[in-house]
């Protein structure tokens, strides 16, 4: 037995000691005492210990005298937890540093890195990534300046009246051009609309009328083809009154001077307001008819620039609305049944354009008080008296015809959100040559199609779909655009992201204006800093504006006018839109809507800079399309509407005392505005703290952002009765403008009631005010609730 114990002790002496601390699970504080415990339990390492610097199993056992290197393995295992912990700390620190840097760069540049090499059905990103500067370079490299000028010249030479046979030929030519591009879809959309044209057999006439009512000398209307579409037909007789621009304040000034307006024929200057607004206001004040002329004072007096001939009249429709006025609120498809109604925007009085020469003859016959100095124009022989003057008889024989019009569409599908559309369009038709009116826009549109098609061939693919549209019927009040919106409204308000209009984009080379939704103002500012000024070398468009006006948006940004196709997108469909244009420094383009709107006159007006200005517009529009179609997060400033509401509320504050005296308050409006601002700020914080690589989350945010404009369409009025439901931009009793106008009656005699649909003299009505306030408040509150997202996130303390 003693021999056995002795042998066992010898074996234990030479056998490697099993280290419990290496192989057992060590956690928490025990880890700190690991090496100390090992030293206490074990012996000193042998002198022949090999340090752990092996790179593979082939070197195991390389130490002399040891076949099983358990001692050095034990030391390696002792160091392993420290190595793991150190690696984790380094990795975590690097990850956090990279994350913060990435978030900061995204916040600073607004999604400046655009992945354009992805495929719809593949996660493979091996095709590469293009940065914003690369994408800009690609776009500018393919954009062709010379092609656009040639297209403007050739298009202006072609007759293209809406619905005409020659227009059909142009449609086919454009379709042929599009078919040669790398596009996913090309198609047309035909509507049968009611258009009004002059009757060649029975032209419109204007006669003097004697004191006994007899028809006397006929005044020449030089061009019988110049007319006002949608004017009331028949004859109107009355004494002539000069009414400046025919604005509401102009007619109120005439009433204050005891000039009789009821039963008169008003002579008004073209400009400032649309033809339709002039006629509607004249009708409100009881006039029997309207004559509209171009005064030389409204155009450039530069002798080096061409001017409008004094025997030319200006064309313009007088429907206070957009689309086919004989199917209001409904699309004009063939064989579709409609209720027998007409648009409330159709006038009940006739209107006719006349030349400056004819207006001069009329003004010289006027008596009565002399017009204010600011009302006087530049007709040399005219004293500019207010009237009344001799009697006149106006006869309008326009006739309505059912006419097919065709819109042309081309599409590049997006790879990530193909069901969201970024739309850009331009009017194609024109009453005359229409170089500035529609040839410029058509040329830019076709060049952008070609440019983006070339980019697609070079690997570019937008995240969202690009939709290019050539509109017909624009000269009759954006008929083609509005009918398309009416036909597909239930789809478009969910899918259309933004509309960009190219109409009237080059009317000069001096000032730049953007008529737009507030959602696009910040993006426009950013893009202006990327586009070179066409007439100030070394400056961007933003530099050009900011140099003279530190508050650039006050100088550049304007509300959308009703005579723009962009207006229907926003006020009717709830889609944010923009229409931008270059204009003369101090005067309007004189040839718009005349037969002198030729390529030659446009070229002379811009003194040879037409190609440069057109190129600047194309660059601006193209870069807008790139940002809107490819940024992961839509670059729409939804928070800006909070400032818009605040500005409008400022107009209401002046009446708070009057309302308080009647026991009324505007507190609900203030509360709704506060809820909207809080919802916008909350959404902004959610987006900032989110990962842009999360496609599902980004899509959820984009859906909420792109519908903000739609939230401001009143849900409490019928689209058929009030098609322009936007509470800031629309028309009707539900709008903020109508509410302010009604409040003004608290301090007036009610003379403005007619414009709000009331009989003159009724004045302020408390029941009507309460209804207006409710419609406005709940539309604002609905916008705030929708922006909040899910119902459990809504602030219900209203």
Curated annotation (Swiss-Prot):
Residues bearing glycans: 235, 334, 535
Membrane topology term: Single-pass type II membrane protein
Segments in the Extracellular topological domain: 103-798
Organism placement in taxonomy: Eukaryota, Metazoa, Chordata, Craniata, Vertebrata
Similarity comment text for this entry: Belongs to the peptidase M28 family. M28B subfamily.
SUBUNIT field: Homodimer.
Bias-annotated ranges (Acidic residues): 33-44
Renumbered ranges of motif Endocytosis signal: 23-26
Database matches in SUPFAM superfamilies: PA domain, Transferrin receptor-like dimerisation domain, Zn-dependent exopeptidases
Annotated organism of origin: Rattus norvegicus
GN (gene name): Tfr2
TM helices/strands, residue ranges: 82-102
InterPro entries assigned: PA_dom_sf, PA_domain, Peptidase_M28, Peptidase_M28B, TFR-like_dimer_dom_sf, TfR1/2_PA
Gene Ontology MF terms in the entry: co-receptor binding; transferrin receptor activity
Keywords tagged on the record: Cell membrane, Disulfide bond, Glycoprotein, Membrane, Receptor, Signal-anchor, Transmembrane, Transmembrane helix
Keyword Nucleus: no
Topological domains, Cytoplasmic: 1-81
Gene3D superfamilies: 3.50.30.30, Transferrin receptor-like, dimerisation domain (1.20.930.40), Zn peptidases (3.40.630.10)
PANTHER family recorded: N-ACETYLATED-ALPHA-LINKED ACIDIC DIPEPTIDASE, TRANSFERRIN RECEPTOR PROTEIN 2
Protein name, per record: Transferrin receptor protein 2
Region (Disordered): 25-44
First-listed, main subcellular location of the protein, grouped into a coarse class: membrane
Cellular component, GO annotation: cytoplasmic vesicle; external side of plasma membrane; HFE-transferrin receptor complex; plasma membrane
CDD domains, per the entry: M28_TfR, PA_TfR
């Amino acid at each position: 037995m003693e021999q056995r114990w002795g042998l066992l002790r010898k074996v234990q002496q030479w056998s490697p000691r099993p280290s419990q601390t290496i192989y057992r699970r060590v956690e928490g504080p025990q880890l700190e005492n690991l090496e100390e415990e090992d030293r206490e339990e074990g012996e000193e390492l042998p002198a022949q210990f090999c340090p752990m610097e092996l790179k593979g199993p082939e070197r195991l056992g390389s130490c002399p005298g040891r076949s099983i290197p358990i001692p050095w393995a034990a030391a390696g295992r002792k160091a392993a937890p420290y190595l793991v912990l150190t690696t984790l700390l380094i990795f975590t620190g690097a990850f956090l540093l990279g994350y913060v840097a990435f978030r900061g760069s995204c916040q600073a540049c607004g999604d400046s890195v655009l992945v354009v090499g992805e495929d719809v059905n593949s996660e493979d990103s091996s095709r590469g990534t293009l940065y914003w500067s690369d994408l800009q370079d690609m776009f500018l490299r393919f954009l062709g300046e010379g092609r656009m000028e040639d297209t403007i010249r050739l298009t202006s030479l072609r007759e293209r009246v809406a619905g005409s046979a020659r227009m059909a030929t142009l449609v086919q030519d454009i379709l042929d051009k599009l078919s040669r591009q790398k596009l996913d879809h090309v198609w047309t959309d035909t509507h049968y609309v009611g258009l009004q044209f002059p009757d060649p057999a029975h032209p419109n006439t204007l006669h003097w009328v004697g004191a006994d009512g007899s028809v006397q000398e006929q005044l020449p209307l030089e061009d019988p083809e110049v007319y006002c579409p949608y004017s009331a037909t028949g004859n109107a007789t009355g004494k002539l009154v000069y009414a400046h621009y025919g604005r509401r304040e102009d007619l109120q000034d005439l009433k204050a001077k005891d000039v009789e307006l009821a039963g008169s024929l008003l002579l008004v200057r073209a400009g400032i307001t649309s033809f339709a607004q002039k006629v509607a206001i004249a009708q409100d004040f009881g006039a029997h008819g309207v004559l509209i002329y171009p005064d030389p004072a409204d155009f450039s007096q530069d002798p080096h620039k061409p001017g409008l001939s004094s025997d030319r009249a200006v064309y313009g429709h007088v429907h206070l609305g957009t689309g086919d006025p004989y199917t209001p609120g409904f699309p004009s498809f063939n064989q579709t049944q409609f209720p027998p109604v007409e648009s409330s925007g159709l006038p009940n009085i006739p209107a006719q354009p006349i030349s400056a020469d004819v207006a001069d003859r009329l003004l010289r016959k006027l008596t009565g008080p002399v017009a204010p100095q600011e009302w006087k124009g530049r007709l040399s022989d005219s004293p500019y008296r207010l009237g009344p003057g001799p009697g006149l008889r106006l006869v309008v024989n326009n006739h309505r015809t059912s006419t097919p019009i065709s819109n042309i569409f081309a599409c590049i599908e997006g790879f990530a959100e193909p069901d969201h559309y970024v739309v850009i369009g331009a009017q194609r038709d024109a009453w005359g040559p229409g170089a500035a009116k529609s040839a410029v826009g058509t040329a830019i549109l076709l060049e952008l199609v070609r440019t983006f098609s070339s980019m697609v061939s070079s690997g570019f693919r937008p995240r969202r779909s690009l939709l290019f549209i050539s509109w017909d019927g624009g000269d009759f009040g954006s008929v083609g655009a509005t009918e398309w919106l009416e036909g597909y409204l239930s789809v478009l308000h969910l899918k259309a992201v933004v509309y960009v209009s190219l109409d009237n984009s080059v009317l000069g080379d001096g000032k730049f204006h953007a008529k737009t939704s507030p959602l696009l103002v910040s993006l426009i500012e950013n893009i202006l800093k990327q586009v070179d000024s066409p007439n100030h070398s070394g400056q961007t468009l933003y530099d050009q504006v900011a140099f003279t006006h530190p508050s650039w948006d006050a100088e550049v940004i304007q509300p959308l006018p009703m005579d723009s196709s962009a207006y229907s997108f926003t006020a009717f469909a709830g889609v944010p839109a923009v229409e931008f244009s270059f204009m003369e420094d101090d005067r309007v383009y004189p040839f718009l809507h005349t037969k002198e709107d030729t390529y030659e006159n446009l070229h002379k007006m811009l003194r040879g800079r037409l190609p440069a200005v057109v190129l600047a517009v194309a660059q601006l529009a193209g870069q807008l399309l790139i940002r809107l179609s490819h940024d992961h997060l839509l670059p729409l400033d939804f928070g800006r509407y909070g400032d818009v509401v605040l500005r409008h509320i400022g107009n209401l504050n002046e009446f708070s005392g009057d309302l308080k005296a009647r026991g009324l308050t505007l507190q609900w409006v203030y509360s709704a505005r506060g809820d909207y601002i809080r919802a916008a700020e909350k959404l902004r914080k959610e987006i900032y703290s989110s990962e842009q690589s999360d496609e599902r989350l980004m899509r959820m945010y984009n859906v909420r952002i792109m519908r903000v404009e739609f939230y401001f369409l009143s849900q409490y009025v019928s689209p058929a009765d009030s098609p322009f439901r936007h509470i800031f931009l629309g028309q009707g009793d539900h709008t903020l403008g109508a509410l302010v106008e009604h409040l003004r009656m608290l301090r007036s005699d009610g003379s403005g009631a007619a414009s709000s649909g009331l009989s003159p003299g009724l004045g302020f009505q408390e029941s009507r005010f309460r209804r207006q306030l409710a419609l406005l408040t709940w539309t604002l509150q609905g916008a705030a609730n929708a922006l909040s997202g899910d119902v459990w996130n809504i602030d219900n303390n209203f």
